[in-house]
Amino acid sequence: MAPNTSTMDETGLPVERDFSFRILTACFLSLLILSTLLGNTLVCAAVIRFRHLRSKVTNFFVISLAVSDLLVAVLVMPWKAVAEIAGFWPFGSFCNIWVAFDIMCSTASILNLCVISVDRYWAISSPFQYERKMTPKAAFILISVAWTLSVLISFIPVQLSWHKAKPTWPLDGNFTSLEDAEDDNCDTRLSRTYAISSSLISFYIPVAIMIVTYTSIYRIAQKQIRRISALERAAVHAKNCQTTTGNGNPVECSQSESSFKMSFKRETKVLKTLSVIMGVFVCCWLPFFISNCMVPFCGSEETQPFCIDSITFDVFVWFGWANSSLNPIIYAFNADFQKAFSTLLGCYRLCPTTNNAIETVSINNNGAVMFSSHHEPRGSISKDCNLVYLIPHAVGSSEDLKREEAGGIPKPLEKLSPALSVILDYDTDVSLEKIQPVTHSGQHST
């Protein structure tokens, strides 16, 4: 066997292998950055181009999220990618500004996700109150709070060097001074106080809020789906019972088991959607923030507890930034945005126009169960076919009639929010945009 004569670089890897690894890293990171840029740019362009997307207050939060993720792709990811490929930080004193941008943009992205979850919970739990109070001004206030908090925990501590810890051990094991290490790697070791406090504000508190809100959303949606299914069965049952034979005898009414299966299918879709939202977010950011709180407590050697090698830490960092490339897919891929994207990309006629059978079930203040169903080809204007079934009041008591005459809700519908509309897409996944509040007249608010 011929002796191995390949040269080794400073990392101990063969030069050929190190070069190939750098090429693969460059390709992967370039694709990640480009996908993040494309996705979030499309969201921003769609909102600027199409007025109906700007008319929905909920989309204000999606826009803010897209802007924060776009800034991650412009101000944060490219600089770190160059450093990863080069093997050192080539931008000198820009390190501190870059660190501040990193903290600000990442925090803004996470806080915007938190605001979206609170907005959806409020819209579903208190639709009448949401419709009155969630104005564009209120939305701008929430967005301003998220961005202000992101700036406060990033630029001020970084510029005043409050975030730095006194060095106890080198990250690469061979530097002679803190300044030289930061100039070469831009790997500033955070102080324990700043690491914990910033992690609480940037991740742990928001993720706790998101878990509570999305769990509550699922419970509300589950109850609404079951009650609406019961009302569907009651409406069909009442309609069938009014059918008579030629002899004037009523036809025997029967209940179908398909409604129970449909109810289970709807609940499963809602659960799957919420699981994807939380699962992607937690999987992307949790490893980084766990390690971010562990590293400051690391001892003088990397082999001690709480110590994480620099390669693993960098992988966790990129996992977190990858969330910015996935957010447009999760939060902006409803029917409205899909049509806008198709138009912007010029594939309005080339994209497949699969039919989406959509059924809208809403209940107005008069106790009427409204079913709106239509087949909506992508890129076309939907044509609704509305069927209104009024639950017969004869099944209620005289107290129910008094409630109706007084403008109230019949007792069987009392626990069901009269302003909640659940839109169920049988061919596509359920999204949070498909659970919308409606006005007093039973019409969907925009």
Curated annotation (Swiss-Prot):
Glycans are attached at residue 4. The chain crosses the membrane at residues 23-48, 60-86, 96-118, 138-162, 193-218, 273-299, 313-337. SMART domains: 7TM_GPCR_Srsx. GO terms for molecular function: arrestin family protein binding; dopamine binding; dopamine neurotransmitter receptor activity; dopamine neurotransmitter receptor activity, coupled via Gs; G protein-coupled receptor activity; G-protein alpha-subunit binding; heterotrimeric G-protein binding. Residues 49-59, 119-137, 219-272, 338-446 are cytoplasmic. GO terms for biological process: adenylate cyclase-activating dopamine receptor signaling pathway; adult walking behavior; associative learning; astrocyte development; behavioral fear response; behavioral response to cocaine; cell migration; cerebral cortex GABAergic interneuron migration. It is a multi-pass membrane protein. A lipid is attached at residues 347, 351 (S-palmitoyl cysteine). It is found in: Cell membrane; Endoplasmic reticulum membrane; Cell projection, Cilium membrane; Cell projection, Dendrite. Dopamine receptor whose activity is mediated by G proteins which activate adenylyl cyclase. Interacts with DNAJC14 via its C-terminus. Interacts with DRD2. Interacts with DORIP1. This is D(1A) dopamine receptor. It comes from Mus musculus. The gene is Drd1.
